[in-house]
């Protein structure tokens, strides 16, 4: 071409890998267009400050450095293109390209050259590699001599690149002469500070609009100086430094803690920040609720009156969490979520609970549930398949608590444990008002049915030992036990404690057969029944009392859920395990019963309900015989 050179199949290297396109070098500068359009890079010749040629595998690379510190790399030139393009650039731009050599020795020690926003690692005088500091998301000082750089890897993944540089670590010994330190500030710290000062050149190099010092952050844990810039948020700690673009801020949450002088401010991110191998989609900041600040923004009046009109004010005075949230909302444009209509029994905004092994608080919000502080877990209502209330066994140490299971449409489950029972009605009413599907005890239930079941549980929990004492005094010990077992259908487990399920979540109340339950009831109730006799009698009276307690073999008996399951599955167990010992059949049945599907448990419960009605009628007739009816029945039989 008379007015320049045109090259096809030239790739632009940088963030997101390489992008193929077309490059045109003309008298006014350089223009590169991506294949398919949408993206173009134009460099005016007046902005060029340096040009380099480098031999790379199978082609040549042209490097263009501009005044802003940016460095563009165009790859795909043939050997014969180098000479013609060099002479053209000399005549039109007045810059002679410099030839650089690539180190192929494989050595991993050398020197670092920091120029503009580029970090170049040199082995001797040859370049081993270079990275753009504009892509550095954060820096970490590991120990006294290692500095790790982590890159904006999520942006790379958005470009659908299978392989990308995520982090790189430099070892800076104390004997380093390029970055001289002292006892309090080793060379690695000097190198990290230099990187941090250069990583913000260009569009992100503006001064902080406002800085909040010494803020406690629970996730990722530490104390940080929080800097709010025009285009990004910065968390600067003693060992970690995070730079977060406002485009990554999805939503802000302002959530007061119940009965404590602190308030959570949560910054939800997409993509999340990364520390080592851990991702942090939520930054949890904790402010003192009553702390008042007076802040002035370092921002020009032109920006305040144009871009940030009705979004920011020149000065703010108020509670620190309110001031921080308002400024961050104005800069990022993210929406703020506050507590909704839910109130706990203590008029708070959350209920205490545990998630996995961590204690925290669960916030029922208008469109989501949020568990804080660790691990911060956000569950949107639209992602929920159903919720389930799970009670703890009556009479146990945890009888005053219940669990809340939230199952997502992706089949993932979140179990919030040890919620106080007096929070049930508030939670149930709130969840019902949101139209969320509620399941209880492993089966679909209507709202009123669930309420009735849980109310029964509450009644049972008032004084369960009183009913046991009454039944034992009446000589019918097994009746109350079977009724109690029906209420605990979902806590039912294997017929023996050797089933291997002792570590499951329901091990406190389940994984035991009815005879196993009878033993502690006898031990617990035996001293209570003869308590008054002990004052007037002796040990012989207690022995006589125990000898009198004999069961009538003709008394009606109820059938447990495990017995129903055993009747239907015993033959299948024998078929699946030929030659299995008789003592092992019960263990296998117990394992299968614990792992049986929701539908099968529902069928078992239906059979239990039917059997309970039968048992209730028979035991009523057994306890209250009617002589006339019995005589007439005998007459008819004899006849």
From Swiss-Prot:
- Composition bias (Polar residues) maps to 618-639
Q: Does the keyword Iron-sulfur apply?
A: no
Q: Which GO terms describe its molecular function?
A: DNA binding; histone binding; nucleosome binding
The leader peptide range reads none
Please give the residue ranges the record annotates as the region Disordered.
Answer: 469-559, 612-639
Tell me yes or no: is Nucleus among this UniProt entry's keywords: yes
Localization annotation: Nucleus; Chromosome
According to the entry, DNA is bound by residues in 555-623
Which InterPro entries does the entry mention?
HMG_box_dom, HMG_box_dom_sf, PH-like_dom_sf, RTT106/SPT16-like_middle_dom, RTT106/SSRP1_HistChap/FACT, SSRP1-like_PH1, SSRP1/POB3, SSRP1/POB3_N
Keyword set for this entry?
Answer: Chromosome, DNA damage, DNA repair, DNA replication, DNA-binding, Nucleus, Transcription, Transcription regulation
Acidic residues bias (residue ranges) = 474-506
Kindly list the GO CC terms recorded for this protein. Answer: FACT complex
Lineage, top-rank taxon, reads Eukaryota
Q: Which family does this protein fall into?
A: Belongs to the SSRP1 family.
Please give the subunit comment from the record.
Component of the FACT complex, a stable heterodimer of SPT16 and SSRP1.
Main role? Component of the FACT complex, a general chromatin factor that acts to reorganize nucleosomes. The FACT complex is involved in multiple processes that require DNA as a template such as mRNA elongation, DNA replication and DNA repair. During transcription elongation the FACT complex acts as a histone chaperone that both destabilizes and restores nucleosomal structure.
Q: What's the name of the protein? A: FACT complex subunit SSRP1
Native species of this protein?
A: Catharanthus roseus
């Amino acid at each position: 071409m008379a007015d320049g050179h045109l090259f096809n199949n030239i790739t632009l290297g940088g963030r997101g890998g390489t992008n193929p396109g077309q490059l045109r070098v003309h008298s006014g500068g350089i223009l590169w267009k991506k294949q398919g359009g949408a993206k173009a890079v134009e460099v005016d010749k007046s902005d060029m400050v340096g040009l380099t040629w480098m031999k790379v595998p199978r082609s040549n690379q042209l490097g263009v450095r501009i005044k802003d510190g940016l460095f563009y790399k165009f790859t795909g030139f043939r050997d014969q293109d180098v000479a013609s393009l060099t002479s053209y650039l000399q005549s039109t731009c007045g810059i002679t390209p410099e030839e650089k050599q690539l180190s192929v020795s494989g050595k991993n020690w050398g020197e670092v050259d920091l120029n503009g926003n580029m970090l170049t690692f040199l082995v001797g005088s040859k370049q081993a590699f270079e990275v753009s500091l504009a892509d550095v998301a954060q820096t970490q000082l590991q120990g006294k001599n290692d500095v790790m750089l982590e890159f904006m890897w999520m942006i790379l993944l958005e470009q659908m690149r299978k392989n990308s540089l995520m982090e790189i670590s430099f070892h800076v010994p104390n004997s380093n002469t390029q970055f001289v330190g002292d006892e309090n500030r080793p060379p690695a710290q000097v190198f990290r500070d230099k990187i941090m000062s250069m990583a913000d050149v260009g569009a992100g190099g503006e001064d902080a609009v406002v800085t909040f010092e010494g803020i406690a952050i629970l996730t990722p844990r530490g104390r940080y100086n929080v800097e709010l810039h025009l285009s990004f948020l910065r968390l600067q700690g003693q060992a970690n430094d995070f730079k977060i673009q406002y485009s990554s801020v999805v939503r802000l949450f302002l959530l007061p803690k119940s009965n404590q002088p602190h308030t959570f401010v949560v910054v939800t991110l997409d993509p999340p920040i990364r520390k080592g191998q851990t991702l942090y989609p939520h930054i949890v900041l904790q402010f003192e609720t009553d702390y008042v600040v007076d802040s002035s923004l370092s921002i020009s009046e032109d920006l305040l009156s144009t871009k940030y009109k009705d979004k920011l004010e020149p000065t703010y005075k108020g509670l620190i969490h309110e001031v921080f949230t308002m400024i961050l909302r104005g800069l990022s444009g993210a929406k703020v979520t506050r507590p909704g209509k839910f109130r706990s029994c203590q008029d708070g905004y959350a209920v205490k609970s545990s998630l996995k092994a961590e204690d925290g608080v669960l916030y029922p919000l208008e469109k989501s549930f949020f568990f804080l502080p660790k691990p911060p877990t956000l569950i949107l209502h639209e992602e929920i398949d159903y919720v389930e209330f799970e009670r703890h066994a009556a009479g146990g140490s945890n009888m005053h608590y219940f669990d809340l299971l939230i199952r997502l449409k992706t089949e993932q489950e979140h179990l919030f444990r040890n919620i106080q029972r007096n929070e049930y009605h508030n939670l149930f009413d709130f969840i019902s008002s949101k139209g969320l599907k509620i399941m209880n005890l492993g089966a679909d239930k209507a709202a009123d049915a669930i309420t009735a079941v849980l109310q029964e549980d509450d009644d049972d929990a008032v004084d369960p030992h009183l009913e046991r004492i009454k039944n034992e005094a009446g000589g019918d010990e097994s009746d109350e036990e079977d009724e109690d077992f029906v209420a605990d259908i979902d806590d039912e487990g294997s017929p023996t404690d050797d089933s291997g399920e002792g570590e499951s979540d329901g091990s406190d109340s389940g994984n035991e057969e009815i005879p196993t339950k009878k033993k502690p009831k006898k031990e617990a109730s035996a001293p209570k029944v003869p308590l008054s006799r002990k004052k007037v009698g002796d040990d012989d009276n207690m022995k006589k009392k125990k000898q009198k307690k004999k069961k009538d073999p003709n008394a009606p008996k109820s059938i447990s859920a495990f017995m129903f399951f055993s009747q239907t599955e015993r033959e299948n167990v024998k078929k699946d395990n030929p030659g299995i010992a008789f003592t092992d059949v019960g263990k296998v049945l117990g394992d299968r019963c614990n792992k049986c599907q929701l539908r099968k448990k529902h069928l078992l419960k239906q059979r239990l309900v039917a059997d309970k009605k039968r048992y209730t009628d028979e035991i009523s007739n057994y306890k209250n015989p009617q002589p006339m009816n019995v005589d007439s029945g005998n007459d008819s039989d004899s006849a």
